[in-house]
A protein has these predicted regions:
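Short amphipathic alpha-helix with an adjacent loop that forms part of the alpha/beta core around
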Residues: 122-129, 176-184
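Substrate-recognition "cap/lid" segment bordering the active-site pocket of phosphatases
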Residues: 84-134, 140, 144
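Short acidic-hydrophobic, aromatic-tinged amphipathic segments that line or gate anion-handling sites
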Residues: 113-117, 168-177, 181
């Protein structure tokens, strides 16, 4: 078994949405975000998300559910964990993002790659084709990209993504469910 985990960050490892909603309440009262993985909500929402991703707020996200506990356990059991987030390429925001992850989970990630804002993850995932890795994501289009490459794919269920089904995409509620499925 190749012990490789590929994971998105926001909505999977870190609780981006709660922190973003706190930011909205403070700076944009009355604004709402329904699905952080698409911009059908309008140009203004996309602009606010990009702005948020480049503020100091991005360095202080809390963990998503049981991510710290279970990813640490994976690491202790010899798994190599690689993250990919499409939060944008501001060097200072990226540094804060990496520090946030490292502060919550010291030495758990082998690497965190940060790609341009909202860029699909197909190119990043393609380097892992045939590796036996697993892929964890909350955005449907990126989950499908992984599944179509033959990468075992888990979709972290959220209010905005759990009403779809796709061959090769397994829906899960938390990291413990993934751990139990891949270590049995």
């Amino acid at each position: 078994v190749h012990k490789i985990i590929l994971t998105d960050i926001d909505g999977v490892v870190l609780d981006w949405q709660t922190h973003f909603n706190d930011y909205l309440d403070k700076y944009y009262p009355g604004q709402e975000l329904f699905d952080p993985t698409v911009f059908a909500q309008g140009e203004e929402t996309g602009k606010i998300i990009r702005e948020f991703n480049n503020t100091a707020w991005i360095g202080f996200l809390k963990p998503w559910k049981d991510s710290v506990e279970v990813l640490t356990e994976f690491k202790e059991n010899g798994w190599h964990i690689f993250g990919c987030t499409s939060m944008g390429t501001d060097q200072y925001a990226n540094s804060l993002r990496k520090k946030n992850i490292e502060n919550l989970m010291p030495d758990v990630f082998a690497r965190v790659d940060i790609i341009p804002f909202m860029e699909p993850k197909g190119h990043w995932l393609s380097q892992w084709r045939g590796s036996g890795a697993i892929w964890v994501e909350d955005k449907w289009s990126n989950a499908i990209l992984g599944a179509d490459m033959g990468i075992r794919t888990f979709l972290m269920k959220q209010s905005y993504n759990s009403n779809h089904d796709y061959k090769g995409v397994e829906k899960i509620d938390n990291w413990r469910q993934i751990y139990n499925k891949v270590t049995q």
